[in-house]
C-alpha cells in the first residue's frame, strides 16, 4: 500500500478547495427543501435544479473556451462570485423568482467551479498521474458533499437555514482567498 497510488500530491490543494466547495453545495442539497418550506417557496424549489442545470449547461462550454483562450482564473473568480451570489440570493429569497435566480447562479458558480477545478487538478499534475489527479479531485469533492450534511446538521438546532446560507456565502468568499493562495496567484497569462 502506497498513498501515492491513490492521491496525487500536486492536486491536493485543489482537492481541498473543492472539498469546501462541495460543503457549500451540500448545504443546498440538504437544506433547500426545508428552507423553501419555511419561506413558502416549495413549488418554486421543485424547479431550482432545472434552472441550475440549464445555466450550467449553457455556461460550461463558454467557460471551457475562455480557459483555453486565457487561463483558469478568468473563469474561476467569476464562478466564485456567482457562488457567493447564490447564497446571498437564497438569504433574500422571499419569492419564487429570486429562489430560481439563485439556481441560475449556482449553475454558473458551482457548475463551472467543479469542471474548472478538475481541469486544474489535472493541469498541475504530471501526465503519468492524470488519473490519480482526477481521483484526488473527486476525493475532495466527495468528502465535502458526503460529510457536509452531517457537519452542517450539527448546527441546525442552534441556527436557522437562512443563517446557514449566510455562513456559506462567507465560506465561499474565504474559499476564494484559499484558491488565490494555493493556485490562483501562480497563474499568469495564457497557461494552456
Task: Give residue spans per PLM region.
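Extracytoplasmic gate region of multi-pass secondary transporters
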Residues: 11-49, 57
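Loop-to-transmembrane helix entry/capping segments in MFS-fold secondary transporters
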Residues: 42-43, 127-137
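Residue-level signature of mid-helix packing/kink "hotspots" within the transmembrane helices
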Residues: 53-61, 145-146
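Helix-to-loop junctions at the C-terminal end of transmembrane segments
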Residues: 59-71, 156-157
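Structural signature of the two symmetry-related core transmembrane helices
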Residues: 74-89, 169
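Helix-loop junctions at membrane interfaces in 12-TM secondary transporters
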Residues: 91-102
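Intracellular juxtamembrane helix-capping segments at the cytosolic ends
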Residues: 112-125
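A membrane-interface helix-boundary motif in multi-pass transporters
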Residues: 154-172
Amino acid at each position: 500500500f502506497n498513498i501515492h497510488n491513490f492521491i496525487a500530491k500536486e492536486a491536493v490543494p485543489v482537492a481541498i478547495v473543492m472539498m469546501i466547495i462541495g460543503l457549500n453545495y451540500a448545504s443546498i442539497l440538504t437544506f433547500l427543501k426545508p428552507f423553501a418550506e419555511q419561506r413558502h417557496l416549495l413549488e418554486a424549489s421543485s424547479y431550482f435544479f432545472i434552472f441550475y442545470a440549464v445555466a450550467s449547461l449553457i455556461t460550461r462550454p463558454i467557460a471551457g473556451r475562455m480557459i483555453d483562450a486565457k487561463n483558469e482564473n478568468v473563469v474561476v473568480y467569476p464562478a466564485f462570485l456567482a457562488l457567493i451570489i447564490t447564497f446571498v440570493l437564497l438569504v433574500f429569497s422571499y419569492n419564487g423568482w429570486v429562489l430560481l435566480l439563485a439556481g441560475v447562479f449556482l449553475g454558473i458558480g458551482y457548475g463551472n467551479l467543479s469542471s474548472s477545478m478538475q481541469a486544474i487538478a489535472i493541469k498541475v499534475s504530471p501526465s503519468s498521474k492524470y488519473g490519480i489527479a482526477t481521483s484526488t479531485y473527486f476525493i475532495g469533492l466527495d468528502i465535502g458533499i458526503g460529510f457536509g450534511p452531517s457537519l452542517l446538521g450539527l448546527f441546525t438546532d442552534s441556527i436557522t437555514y437562512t443563517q446557514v446560507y449566510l455562513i456559506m456565502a462567507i465560506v465561499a468568499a474565504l474559499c476564494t482567498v484559499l484558491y488565490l493562495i494555493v493556485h490562483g496567484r501562480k497563474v499568469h497569462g495564457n497557461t494552456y
